[in-house]
Amino acid sequence: SGRRTWAATSAAGIKAGLGLEATAHSPCVTATPEKRRATLDRMRDAGISNVRALRGDPPQGETEWTATDGGLRYSRELIELIRDEYPEFAIGAACFPEVHIHATDAESDLRYTKEKVDAGAGFLITQLFYDNRCYYEFVGRAREIGIDVPIIPGIMPITNAGQIRKITSMCGSDIPERLQAELELRADDPAAATDFGVAYATLP
């Protein structure tokens, strides 16, 4: 599909144009293993080295995730496919400092993260977060159960306050009260809100 081609070409463009290593997303949603292999072939041919294996969100307009007929159900299955058939890729997976929105509890969510690592994920990228304590606490719990791969913070600077509220509500991330208050102060000045959001996400 166009979106899958876009993922490959965007990551390749970042690598070629900026000299930065990029990670292309490879979701299970709406794809059979055959389609997923075709996408992975394009990524490999484009010179991409890093692939982030995801289950993916429900298609636009739908609220429940359902597997495509004959498709993969879990990101772990996609990780295993890439591990076995595309050894040239470094495989990344998602993790959730504030717990996946559909997880039963934090413990089971973390156990599933370990299953992804055991299946072949060599690094993890977190869901976005705006409270560093969530990240550090998550890393500590992950290390305690034997997850020893790099855990990379997922950073999303706030450039649109309304949009970020929608995104965080969808993924279960929290916006701290102090950050909420600062955004409210700049509600009528989008440029100031963007400047603050970028500074909040990037400064120590």
Segments (PLM) and residue ranges:
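Active-site beta-loop-alpha junctions enriched in small/polar residues
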Residues: 1, 25-31, 54-58, 94-100, ...
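Structural preference for beta-strand elements that scaffold enzyme active sites
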Residues: 21-25, 50-52, 88-94, 122-123, ...
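Active-site pocket-lining/capping segments in soluble small-molecule metabolic enzymes
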Residues: 69-96, 102, 145-203
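Active-site-adjacent beta->alpha loops and helix N-cap segments on the catalytic face
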Residues: 2-14, 32-38, 57-82, 103-106, ...
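Conserved, mostly hydrophobic/aromatic
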Residues: 43, 116, 120, 153
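Catalytic beta/alpha-barrel core
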Residues: 1-3, 26, 49-54, 122-131, ...
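Short, acidic/polar
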Residues: 7, 33-41, 104-115, 197-204
